[in-house]
Swiss-Prot record:
Catalytic activity: a 2'-deoxyribonucleoside 5'-diphosphate + ATP = a 2'-deoxyribonucleoside 5'-triphosphate + ADP; a ribonucleoside 5'-diphosphate + ATP = a ribonucleoside 5'-triphosphate + ADP
Active site: H117
Enzyme Commission number(s) of this protein: 2.7.4.6
Subunit structure: Homotetramer.
Protein name as it appears in the record: Nucleoside diphosphate kinase
PANTHER family named among the record's database cross-references: NUCLEOSIDE DIPHOSPHATE KINASE (PTHR11349)
UniProt-listed CDD domains: NDPk_I (cd04413)
This protein's UniProt keywords: ATP-binding, Cytoplasm, Kinase, Magnesium, Metal-binding, Nucleotide metabolism, Nucleotide-binding, Phosphoprotein, Transferase
Organism: Coxiella burnetii (strain Dugway 5J108-111)
An annotated Gene Ontology molecular function: metal ion binding
Binding-site residues, ATP: K11, F59, R87, T93, R104, N114
Functional summary from the UniProt entry: Major role in the synthesis of nucleoside triphosphates other than ATP. The ATP gamma phosphate is transferred to the NDP beta phosphate via a ping-pong mechanism, using a phosphorylated active-site intermediate.
Main location group: cytoplasm
Keyword Calcium on entry: no
Length: 139
């Protein structure tokens, strides 16, 4: 089993619901360690750059607008198979399809306001972590 790191973002909808602590508890119960964290309000250029992979998709403008509407909580998670484990905890992108007990089933309102983001693979995780954190900010 490999120790991995992954990026997690608690999106503006979940921050506004005051469920950061409940989400952190789920990470920890799954054996994921929070090794870096910060709260910030993404600027439009930051959100556009972070989600640039989706720039040709029809939902891109709404995604950028949503991600800049309020503060987000960004963290690096570390643990055995952290990427897959985090994605399992998050649940399906569409909360209506998410399994009961997942973050999205419990806290998300819609496919757009879906509470959390998580890296989808090892290379993406490295890029996303570097986007938000300098090496000396990760413990």
């Amino acid at each position: 089993m490999a120790i991995e790191r992954t990026l997690s973002i608690i999106k503006p909808d979940a921050v506004a619901k005051n469920v950061i602590g409940q989400i952190y508890s789920r990470f920890e119960k799954a054996g994921l360690k929070i090794i870096a964290a910060k709260m910030c309000h993404l600027s439009k250029p930051q959100a556009e750059k972070f989600y640039a992979v989706h720039k040709d998709r029809p939902f891109y403008p709404d995604l950028v607008k949503f991600m800049t509407q309020g503060p987000v909580m960004i963290q690096v998670l570390e643990g055995e198979n952290a990427i897959v484990k985090n994605r399992e905890i998050m649940g399906a992108t569409n909360p209506k399809e998410a399994l009961p007990g997942t973050i999205r089933a419990d806290f998300a309102d819609s496919i757009d306001a879906n509470a959390v983001h998580g890296s989808d693979g090892p290379e993406t995780a490295k890029e996303e972590i570097a986007f938000f954190f300098k090496p000396d900010e990760i413990f």
